[in-house]
Amino acid sequence: WFDDAALFACAVLAAWRAGARVLLLPNTARENIGWGETADIFLTDNLVHKQAWHLPECLAQAQRQPENGRQPENWSVPADAEAHLKTSGSSGKAQIIIKTAAQMQAEAQTLAAALPFGRNGEAVIGSVSPQHLYGFTFRFALALTMGWTMERAQAVYPENLLAATAAHRQAVWI
């Protein structure tokens, strides 16, 4: 579970690059934490579970390590990398939806073609978490595909949406 959309994006891309299957919890309810524990590793940016790898601590640890000057030649993500999204169940029983990296990129490109901003868009501001199906599509895939700014915090209240929007020339709300 991630509150910070940028840390979420880093974790998803790193997991995909490593060949891991990503489970996106819709919230931190006990049932969903249990589902998350079926993964090989549970990454988060908050302390929702004591066995989780708290990403800010991992990043701080990594920064203390000696630097490796070599960079991988290819940072690409496999097209068949999977994200498993669990719906909230608000319209019945929660369901698991599987999206591949290729599907997410295709969805993002289709959305980008429909929006009036093109590559000149400024930011994606979300009232939903990046783990949500719409958040994953807009706050993650669309922002990364188009090179737009990803507002890190979820705008829980309307005044948060307005404040975040004021900082950008153009913004997409989700």
Predicted regions and their residues:
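Active-site regions of enzymes building and remodeling cell-envelope glycoconjugates
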Residues: 20, 39-42, 47-65
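Conserved pre-ATP/AMP-binding loop-to-beta segment of ANL
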Residues: 57, 61-86, 117-124
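AMP-binding/adenylate-forming
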Residues: 39-47, 98-114, 119-174
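A short, well-structured beta->alpha microelement
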Residues: 21-35, 154-162
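Short, charged/polar "capping" segments at the starts of alpha-helices
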Residues: 7-8, 30-34, 47-53
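Conserved AMP-binding/adenylate-forming
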Residues: 1-28, 122-130
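Conserved AMP-binding A3 loop
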Residues: 74, 80-109
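Conserved G/P- and acidic residue-centered "switch" motifs that form tight phosphate/ATP-binding loops
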Residues: 19, 90, 147
